[in-house]
């Protein structure tokens, strides 16, 4: 007789294991799935586990040459989503051997590579993942981390302040450098290349880096503070990207920048290793994230992309602002902000955290609040993000009616006033605007 029966097999038989006890070394994932009508939840969950690990749609001879029990993904729990008719959270455990060490690229190729186009599912979203220390320890993590960055910059006890230079496209390198100088001279810690600024015909990267470095050193000499500009090293090839990072280091600037989703995890980690070896801070922008994380029932939640960045490496990452959005968003945003900054984060479903995450000793990433913020948001931002964050303005600096430098002064005075008021025990939610009005009287 033949060894096994051909034909399409039920995934449930092998990949749905409700009695499985998860191991400390397992990579865990929580998927929000919307099965097609008529597909049972257990079958859909098992299909997700199978297709993102060892399974295929039929039994194959070569299955006998390995131990599937050791390598297969297991759907170990399914819970209906309250208030949704046909939605479930499927919990899947993967053995760590399925992912190459130190490769976010390979981890994602496994867990979210194929399965999102799966016919039996109407939609699928990766809501959260648990990275075990056994696996996270194979990653370098951020090149410096929060504490080392503060030590390098000699800035303590307050959020760091930045400003994206606008108009983002069209300025010449010389004028761009001038805007950088005015902002830094006014009191900001950092200025930033917009994520779209790479090396376009109106401003080639080398010219921009040079004029920006000049602005940095001039403003440093005049203020006695350490200044930085996120020079965007993102490029069309890894070699070109590293060439730009090398040039930045040769100029003696403290920080470079990368778009980690459009540039890709592989390029990002290569750049991070260079930064680690050469003492450069690495600022990460998340251009393209909304393509992946904006849909509520399909895609990947940003908290997973944030965890992936902490492993792939970066010292700063953009993480939304909360301000002016809904209250519910606040807890969710703070959930992944803590996943970026802290060592140990407890499971807390109200903040969207499905698993307890222990980063052990991996350095933290500074969350960057950017997008439409200005001085009147300061009390709220100080309260929400605390000291370990970067507050990133744009129009909120350069839109000041008196010019860029006064805009930067205002940006610096407001958070310092808020931090002082908070430290004196005043309630920022109630007295914040008053605090800023008071401070403005003494601001030049």
Swiss-Prot record:
The modification N6,N6,N6-trimethyllysine is found at residue 5. InterPro entries: RuBisCO (IPR033966), RuBisCo_large_chain_AS (IPR020878), RuBisCO_lsu_C (IPR000685), RuBisCO_lsu_C_sf (IPR036376), RuBisCO_lsu_fd_N (IPR017443), RuBisCO_lsu_N_sf (IPR036422), RuBisCO_lsuI (IPR020888). The active site is at residues 166, 285. One of its GO terms (molecular function) is monooxygenase activity. Belongs to the RuBisCO large chain family. Type I subfamily. RuBisCO catalyzes two reactions: the carboxylation of D-ribulose 1,5-bisphosphate, the primary event in carbon dioxide fixation, as well as the oxidative fragmentation of the pentose substrate in the photorespiration process. Both reactions occur simultaneously and in competition at the same active site. This is Ribulose bisphosphate carboxylase large chain. It comes from Botrychium strictum.
């Amino acid at each position: 007789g033949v060894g096994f029966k051909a034909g399409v097999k039920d995934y449930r038989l092998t990949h749905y294991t409700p009695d499985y006890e998860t191991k400390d070394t397992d990579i865990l994932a929580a998927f929000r799935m919307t099965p097609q009508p008529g597909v049972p939840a257990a079958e859909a969950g098992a299909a997700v586990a199978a297709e993102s690990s060892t399974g295929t749609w039929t039994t194959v001879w070569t299955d006998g040459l390995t131990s599937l029990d050791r390598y297969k993904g297991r759907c170990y729990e399914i819970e209906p989503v309250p208030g949704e008719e046909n939605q479930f959270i499927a919990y899947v455990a993967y053995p760590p051997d399925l992912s190459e060490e130190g490769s976010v690229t390979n981890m994602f190729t496994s867990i979210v590579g194929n399965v999102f186009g799966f016919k039996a599912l109407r939609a699928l979203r990766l809501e959260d993942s648990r990275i075990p220390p056994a696996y996270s320890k194979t990653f370098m993590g951020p090149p410096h981390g929060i504490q080392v960055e503060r030590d390098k910059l000699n800035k303590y006890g307050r959020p760091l302040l930045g400003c994206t230079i606008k108009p983002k496209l069209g300025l010449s390198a010389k004028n761009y450098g001038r805007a950088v100088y005015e902002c830094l001279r006014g009191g900001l810690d950092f200025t930033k290349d917009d994520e779209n600024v790479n090396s376009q015909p109106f401003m080639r990267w080398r010219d921009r880096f040079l004029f920006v470095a000049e602005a940095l050193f001039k403003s440093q000499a005049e203020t006695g503070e350490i200044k930085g500009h996120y020079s965007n090293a993102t490029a069309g090839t890894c070699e070109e990207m590293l060439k730009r990072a090398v040039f930045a280091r040769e100029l003696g600037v403290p920080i470079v920048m990368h778009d980690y989703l459009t540039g890709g995890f592989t390029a990002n980690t290569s750049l991070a290793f260079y930064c680690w070896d050469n003492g450069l801070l690495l600022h990460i922008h998340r251009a393209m994230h909304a393509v992946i994380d904006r849909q509520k029932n399909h895609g990947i939640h940003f908290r997973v992309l944030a965890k992936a960045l902490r492993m792939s490496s970066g010292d700063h990452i953009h993480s939304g602002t909360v301000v002016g959005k809904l209250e519910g968003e606040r807890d969710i945003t703070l959930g992944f902000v803590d996943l970026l900054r802290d060592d140990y984060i407890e499971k807390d479903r109200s903040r969207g955290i499905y698993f307890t995450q222990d980063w052990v000793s991996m350095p933290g990433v500074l969350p960057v609040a950017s997008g439409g913020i200005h001085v009147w948001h300061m009390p709220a931002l100080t309260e929400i993000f605390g000291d370990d964050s970067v507050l990133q303005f744009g129009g909120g600096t350069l839109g000041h009616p008196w010019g860029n430098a006064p805009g930067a002064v205002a940006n610096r005075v407001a958070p310092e006033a808020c931090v002082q008021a908070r430290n004196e025990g005043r309630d920022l939610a109630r007295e914040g605007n008053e605090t800023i009005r008071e401070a403005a009287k003494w601001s030049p």
